[in-house]
Amino acid sequence: MMTRQKYAIQYENTVPGRFVRRINRFIAEVLIDGDAEQVHVKNTGRLQELLVPDARVTLQKISDPNRKTAYDLISVYKPELKWVNIDSLAPNALMKQYLMNQNYDLVKPEYTYGDSRFDFYMERGEDKYLTEVKGCTLAADLERGIGLFPDAPTKRGVKHLDELAVAATKGYYCEIAFIIQMNGIHMVFPNDDTQPEFGQALIRAAKAGVQIVCYSCHVEADSIRITDAVSDTGRYIGR
């Protein structure tokens, strides 16, 4: 279970909107007070189950004269899940808050090991740690609280898992951290229908000693907060 420490993001300058269509991976059209506006989508995943016509969305106003868009799309409302955070920067920001409160001597973001760059490298005494963070926005089984990752093929994700497996055999304490950006989901399984290679790599990593930890979150229209962490690596080995 988590401590009472609050690991959260509160977005400022937010406004409600209605989703119209996705123009490309980075841009969507929404209605704000009935007016059409092109906004930045802070997630390059498919998000097909979330970004549907007339879906309620939350936008964050960005004051940057050099930007082509004035808003970021940060969350989407889906009735059975309520609010889903789709900000791809949120998982790393939350994990950094969490790691900074775990009594490490060193927490270093964006650390290169082998041929990969991992989200975090930590030290505690003589021990060395590597953590790679993934955000989950795809719900699969609401009754059992299961989400899936990835929602689109990721060669980079497979490479990260294989590099973590190697590091684990060399004495590093390694973790793949799934930040679940929606309510009611507490476990993440590999999306074998989308990319079976990721699931195979996850099993290899687990067998090599990489810990798989799922971080549940409470999500509102303008905020996201970690509520719990569950490590059950054996569940993945036994799949």
Q: Could you say what each language-model-derived stretch is?
A:
Residues Q181-R239:
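Domain-level recognition of nuclease-like catalytic cores that cleave nucleotide substrates
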Residues D35-E49:
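Beta-strand/loop nucleic-acid-binding surfaces
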Residues Y98-D115:
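A short acidic/basic microdomain associated with nuclease active sites
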Residues G17, F118-D151, L164:
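Conserved catalytic cores of phosphodiester-cleaving nucleases, focusing on short active-site segments
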Residues P53-D64, S216-C217:
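Flexible glycine-rich surface loops and low-complexity tracts that mediate binding to linear polymers
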Residues N24-E29:
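Short aromatic-glycine-enriched beta-strand elements
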Residues G145-K155, D162-T194, S216:
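Nucleic-acid nuclease catalytic cores
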Residues G45-T58, H160:
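Short nucleic-acid-contacting surface segments enriched for D/E, G, S/T with interspersed K/R
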